[in-house]
């Protein structure tokens, strides 16, 4: 009737600070659209997304940029790494966009690189890494900006089962250290 395809309807949830919140459902059920609505990578046609009483849907472009640069980060299913940049540059990309000096962002990127278990891989290019290692780089890039909120859109679904399990364990270990608010999207009921 409206000319729109309804991908997400009547969804309401609350995530506490430091909580890991999992959205699980079948492929095609709107999970990825939901997480993209939270970050406004997809523009919702109705409703609200509140972060500390601030409505993301009502934010101006400038406010949205600030939210994405300083309070929120996202880890994608297909890594989203920049192939022409070394691992250390991929990790520091969000800090570069913020205007952080090169030396400072490389120090931060190296710190996070160690945190995700990729010491010594900073000067390599994404094509030189396995899928699991590339996903660790994506995770490190998200952590480097020290966000309050991390959104994960099926980050491990492209990985083989053994690597997937390792990455799940790694994420749980990291969460016990960094205590970020995490929204995790998956279709895999074993995750």
Spans of model-derived segments:
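ABC ATPase NBD coupling module
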Residues: 1-3, 56-73, 97, 102-106
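Catalytic Walker B motif of ABC-type/P-loop ATPase nucleotide-binding domains
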Residues: 150-153
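Helix-to-loop junction immediately C-terminal to a conserved catalytic motif
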Residues: 39
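A short, proline-enriched helix->beta-strand linker immediately N-terminal to the Walker B motif
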Residues: 144-148
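Conserved ABC ATPase "signature" region
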Residues: 1, 52-55, 92, 96, ...
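Conserved ABC ATPase signature
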Residues: 125-129, 133
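Short coil-to-helix segment of the ABC ATPase nucleotide-binding domain corresponding to the Q-loop/switch region
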Residues: 85-92
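Conserved H-loop
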Residues: 179-185
């Amino acid at each position: 009737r409206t000319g729109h395809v309804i991908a997400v309807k009547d969804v309401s949830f609350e995530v506490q600070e430091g909580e890991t919140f999992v959205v699980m459902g079948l492929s095609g059920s709107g999970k990825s659209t939901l997480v993209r609505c939270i970050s406004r990578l997809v523009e919702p046609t109705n409703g609200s997304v509140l972060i500390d009483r601030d409505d993301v849907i009502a934010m101006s472009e400038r406010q949205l940029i600030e939210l994405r640069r300083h309070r929120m980060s996202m880890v994608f299913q297909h890594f989203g790494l920049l192939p022409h940049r070394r691992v250390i540059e991929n990790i520091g990309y969000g800090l570069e966009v913020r205007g952080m000096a090169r030396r400072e962002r490389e120090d931060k990127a190296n710190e996070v690189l160690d945190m995700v278990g990729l010491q010594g891989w900073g000067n390599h290019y994404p094509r030189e890494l396995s899928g699991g290692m590339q996903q660790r780089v994506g995770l490190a890039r998200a952590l480097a900006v020290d966000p309050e909120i991390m959104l994960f859109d099926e980050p491990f679904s492209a990985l083989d089962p053994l690597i997937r399990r390792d990455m799940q364990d790694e994420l749980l270990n990291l969460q016990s250290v960094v205590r970020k608010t995490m929204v995790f999207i998956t279709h895999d009921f074993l995750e």
